[in-house]
Amino acid sequence: MIYQKEVFTAPCPYPLHRLGTPERLLFFDIETTGLSAGKSSLYLIGALSFDGSQWKLVQWMAQRFLEEEQVLRAFTAYCAEYDTLVHFNGDTFDIPFLKACAGQYNLSMPFDQMNSIDLLKQIRPLKSLLSLENLKLKTIERFLKIDREDQYTGGELISVYKTYTNHQSEELKHLLLLHNAEDLKNLPPLLSVLFYKDLSECKLTVLSCVQTEDTLQIACQLAFAVPKDTCFSLSSASFHLEADHLDVTFPLYTGKLRYFYPNYREYYYLPLEDYAIHKKVAQFVDPAHRKKATAKTAYTWQEGCYLPLPAGKKAVSELTLSGETIPVLREEYSSRDCYILFQPERAFLEAYLQLFLQTMSR
């Protein structure tokens, strides 16, 4: 079995403490001769860790198929110092493969006692927003402009490894170790894509607000910078991200909308006036001019300038923004589009923006 260690310094653009205790995080990646542990072999495991000042990359590679168990045992022992595994698609492939492989040797893997962070799962909700062609590791690396020396895919290296087991070529060994090393070394810089996900909880500051006849344009300062400028839409709003600056354009609706009372059984509908009143007041109205309200007729009208709520927001009669309870209005009872009254105060605008940003990670 080949054991190789490399210590190096490199910046990490994303705060590691957001994943866990930095010194207890273990990035890992495996290389195999196929997708099924029962029909293929594990030949390489790489692990990357950070001690607070520098990175350490460790790799264990089987020089022959019979050394698979040695590789497994070495990695299992190494995991003892860590409590969180960080990987790309490891929940679906790497971890199940290692467990199945270990079972063939009656080995117990420590994964059930460790936290697991699958970066693919974290990034998947961002695919459309970032206009990613697919969610392959190299596609995300290209989006972030992360360079590679390695030009092979894992599948292409299967035949390289099989040739290596027969010839023990240094050149082939280098190709195999390089691919795994770059998969791992590129994970810390790849973490920066999580800043887009973190926008859903990001503290932001409204810098300016410009109202036109039918739009509201808001400029904001973010608590962090995103790695790449991008434009996207969320519901009816347009977003432009540039470093730590966010510009958003919302449509404005001016006119009359209905507010539907949630406890409609407490109301009577007045057909001539086209609105509902509470039963305590309705008792003084001629019974010929009132009807028991239904969910569709228990409403009152409000006129003003309104902002849309994010699409898919559950239909409610009220919501709370910046500590204030605000009525939710619609054109019709069955309308999917919901609105709230526009307020120019900064606290309202910042809370309103968060409503939209929270939909990014869904």
Regions found by a protein language model. Give the residues of each.
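DEDD superfamily 3′-5′ metal-dependent exonuclease/proofreading module
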Residues: 1-28, 33-40, 50-362
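Short beta-strand scaffold segments in enzyme catalytic cores
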Residues: 45-47
